[in-house]
Structures are given as structure tokens and as C-alpha cells.
Regions:
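FAD-binding subdomain of flavoenzyme oxidoreductases
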Residues: 145-301
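Residue-level signal for inorganic ion chemistry
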Residues: 96, 107, 224, 340, ...
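General structural feature for long, well-ordered alpha-helical segments within catalytic domains
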Residues: 16-24, 47-53, 76, 80, ...
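C-terminal substrate-recognition/cap domain of FAD-linked oxidoreductases
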Residues: 56-78, 282-464
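N-terminal flexible segment immediately upstream of the FAD-binding catalytic core
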Residues: 1-105, 123-155, 307, 312, ...
Length: 464
């Protein structure tokens, strides 16, 4: 069952061992666990619905609460502290475009605002219900999850927009195909959500960002239906798909999406390379990205993230053996880890990996093989569960991401981390901040920073 006030399935945990907790305590102090609000108390505070009856609209408090917030830290704090400011007045679960059309007509008739909900994994406040006199209807798309068409000749697949990542991949893999879009929220986010938030997957180097994968679709708007036909390319005017990409539900409800698919790779490998310092690691990573090699992923962790991830992983003896070897090879306290992924035909993928390793070794890179890469792939959708466990031990975790050209990557990383650590300095609190480059381009990179700090014991203190 999905957690009502945290991330993911409540049967899955990311355990933190004694060494990991000691590491956090040394960095920022012992955690201060919070007493969370109960689900019953959160539901009890919800106001009555202002919507008139409709056969598709559910008004139960637990349903309204489940569709009220996403996964940003402010959303978490509202749920954990029981400070639910506002929720939708009702939630509908359509199973067809016709039902979405019916719901939009209903919303217009009763003057309701509409918020479109998929997996509720947004960290940007997309699901926040505005205060005001108008009622709010949430349209939850997750019952619209069928594959409607598979065109193997054009390598296009059309899905209802509410399909979750694992369901989408399972339907494609049954025919030997993949979309290849794997954001960290993959297990609980939807195709429609990816499109309207301009999502990027972990293996975007091979498969492309969602704007490269989105070929067309269908949108229901209050004024009528908008069909976006598929074209391999066009030189005729504005690309109407750009109206939908990143629109975050403001234009209308994306009910169908046609995406560009790829044959399942015959071969896939993820390999870890360590560098003695950030300067060498960033230079090597830039050289690999600008070499335009046929890789599927590059992910570079700075020194503090590398240390943090190795510590939180447990397996103290194995990590100790690795670090002894790396020190012997010249990668000591400031070491940074680069994860390299290669997917496709075996010969081509192996050739791309070899070329990347040549560039890495020129800058002092130490290749440690596939074992860490296999472990990363196994846990890549599990690491986000750390937020739940950290909270239980009295710590909050938040993230921020931006993208800059290569000359600005390192200055941006340092500026973000300095700002984060200074944020609570006036209160005498420490912040554990670390960064990785999550999406790499010839022009620049996405800078993804994580902050860990102790809970303050109050909603206002934790939010500050």
C-alpha cells in the first residue's frame, strides 16, 4: 500500500545502519525525531466539499487527502505535522477520454478549478490547491493506463496518459520494445506527468528526454479537444507539442500520448570510475559528454556525495577494501565517482564504454568494474526511500536541480551548497549538502544538490 505521508510502498524501507547514523550525527548532530500526525486526525480536519454531486466524483476525506499534495518537502511537512491547508473538494478517476470531457464540462458548469493528478510525485507544488471561494476538482488519471496502439514499423506506441512507468515498460517489453525513460520517480509517476513536466530519465543520453520521445497526443480542454498528430519532422511553423510539454496541466488534460520507442537493448552495462578530485572528474566527464559517445548514462557524484553514498550503502568491510585499493591508486579523501552506462548492440555498447574509459584514464580515472554499477541499477528506484528512513531518525531531506553551461557547473555547485549550509547557520544548525551531475550534455549539465538537516520539532521550524 502506498504511504499517505511519505514515499512509495509502505512495505519497502531503506535501512540506515549504525555507521550511517553515526556519520550523519557527526556531520550535523543527532537526529530529532518528530511525532507525526495520524491519518485519522489529518482527514478529520478537512472541510466539507463545495462540489455538487456527480457520478464520477468521490468526496470521501481520505480520497481528497490522497490527491492534495505531492512529494516536495513543504508537502511532506504539511502531512507529517498535520497542517493541511487546503485539499480538493472532490476527486474523479476517469477511465476514458469521454469521461474526462464530461468532467471538464461539469467543472465549467459549477465554476470549479481543475487540477490534474497522476502519480502525485511532483516536487514543484503542481498539486497545491489554491485558497479561494471556487471549488477545486482533482482529476486523477491513473485508471487510464492502456496501450492503445503499437506501430512497429514507425516505432511508435500510443498509451492512455495515466499509465505508470512499470506498467508502460511491461506492455512494451512484451513486444520487445522499451521507452527507456527512467526518472527516479519511475515506479510511481505517469506518462502524462512526464510529458507535462518535461521529465528527463536517468538514461537520457541514449533514449532522449521526454520532449524527444513525445511524438503526439490528445488533450481535452474546456474549449474542446486538441489533437496533436505525429510527424517525424516538420519545417512548417510552430510545433504544437511545445504547448503541452511543460504545461503542467494548465492547457488541459492530456488523455493520450504517442511516444517514440526503441528495441530492447541486447546488452547493457553500468560501470563505476573513481577520480582523485572534482577537477579531474568534471574534466573527464565533460570530455566524454562532448565526445558524443553512444552511451546511455553519465552520473558524476562530487566528493561529499561519493562519501555519503558509500557510507549509507553499508557493507563496511567491502567498502573498506575498495577504499584501500583506491588510496593505493591515488583516489583518497577527495575522490569522486562517475557512473557510466552503455546500452544497445553488444559490440557498439562495449566500444563506447572503452572509449569513455580511455578518456577517463587520461585524467586519472580508476575503473573498478561492473559490481557497483549492478548495485546502482538494482537500487536506483529504491534510494528515494531514504527520505522516509531519515525522517524516522529525525532528519529532513530536500533537493534542488538546475542546468547550466559547462563554465558555470562548478561555480553553481559551490554556490548552491554554500547557500544551503548557510541557511541554518544563524540558528546554530548544520546542513549536510552534496551534489551530482544527473544529466550530461555537450553544452553543460544538470546540477542536482541534496540537503540533509535535523528536524526542528515544529512545522514552522522545519519549513524555515
Amino acid at each position: 500500500m502506498k504511504r499517505w505521508n511519505g514515499w512509495g510502498d509502505d512495505s519497502i524501507d531503506f535501512a540506515l545502519g549504525d555507521d550511517a547514523l553515526a556519520f550523519l550525527a557527526e556531520r550535523i548532530g543527532p537526529g530529532l525525531p518528530n511525532v507525526d500526525a495520524s491519518h485519522a486526525s489529518a482527514c478529520a480536519q478537512l472541510p466539507p466539499s463545495r462540489l455538487p454531486p456527480h457520478r464520477l466524483v468521490q468526496l470521501a476525506p481520505e480520497v481528497r487527502l490522497a490527491n492534495a499534495l505531492g512529494q516536495s518537502l513543504p508537502d511532506w511537512l504539511r502531512l507529517r505535522h498535520g497542517r493541511i491547508a487546503s485539499v480538493p473538494d472532490g476527486v474523479a478517476f476517469p477511465d476514458s477520454g469521454a469521461q474526462v470531457r464530461d468532467l471538464l464540462d461539469y467543472a465549467v458548469a459549477c465554476g470549479a478549478l481543475v487540477i490534474v493528478c497522476g502519480g502525485a510525485t511532483s516536487v514543484a507544488g503542481h498539486l497545491t490547491v489554491p485558497a479561494g471561494e471556487r471549488p477545486v476538482l482533482s482529476i486523477n488519471m491513473t485508471r487510464m493506463r492502456a496501450m492503445l496502439n503499437l506501430d512497429t514499423e514507425a516505432q511508435l506506441a500510443t498509451f492512455q496518459a495515466g499509465v505508470f512507468g512499470p506498467d508502460l515498460e511491461a506492455q512494451l517489453r512484451a513486444h520487445g520494445y522499451t521507452l527507456g525513460h527512467f526518472p527516479q520517480s519511475f515506479e510511481y509517476s505517469t506518462l502524462g506527468g512526464w510529458v507535462v513536466t518535461r521529465s528527463s530519465g536517468q538514461q537520457s543520453l541514449r533514449y532522449g528526454r521526454i520532449e524527444q520521445l513525445f511524438a503526439g497526443g490528445r488533450v481535452e480542454t474546456p474549449a474542446g479537444r486538441l489533437d496533436l498528430p505525429t510527424f517525424p519532422a516538420s519545417a512548417a511553423g510552430t510545433d504544437l507539442r511545445e504547448m503541452v510539454l511543460g504545461s503542467e496541466g494548465r492547457l488541459g488534460v492530456l488523455t493520450e500520448a504517442t511516444v517514440r520507442i526503441t528495441r530492447l537493448p541486447h546488452f547493457e552495462t553500468f560501470n563505476a570510475v573513481f577520480f582523485p578530485n572534482w577537477e579531474a572528474a568534471a574534466a573527464a566527464t565533460r570530455a566524454i559528454a562532448q565526445g558524443r559517445l553512444a552511451l546511455s548514462m553519465l552520473r558524476l557524484s562530487n566528493a561529499l556525495e561519493t562519501t555519503t553514498m558509500l557510507t549509507l550503502a553499508g557493507h563496511k568491510k567491502l567498502v573498506g577494501t575498495l577504499e584501500t585499493y583506491l588510496r593505493w591508486r591515488g583516489c583518497a579523501d577527495g575522490k569522486c565517482m562517475l557512473m557510466i552506462g552503455a546500452s544497445g548492440e553488444q559490440a557498439g555498447a562495449k566500444a563506447a564504454l572503452r572509449s569513455a574509459l580511455v578518456l577517463a584514464r587520461r585524467r586519472g580515472g580508476v575503473h573498478v568494474g561492473r559490481k557497483m554499477g549492478d548495485k546502482w541499477k538494482q537500487n536506483r528506484f529504491r534510494n528515494v526511500y531514504l527520505r522516509n528512513t531519515a525522517w524516522q531518525h529525525g532528519y529532513a531531506i530536500d533537493t534542488v536541480e538546475t542546468a547550466v553551461d559547462w563554465p558555470g557547473v562548478t561555480p553553481m555547485m559551490h554556490a548552491i551548497e554554500r547557500a544551503a549550509t548557510a541557511a541554518l547557520g544563524e540558528d546554530g544548525e548544520q546542513v549536510h549538502a552534496y551534489t551530482h551531475l544527473s544529466h550530461l550534455y555537450a553544452q553543460g549539465a544538470s546540477v542536482y544538490s541534496t540537503f540533509v538537516y535535523r528536524l526542528a520539532g515544529s512545522y514552522e521550524g522545519d519549513l524555515a
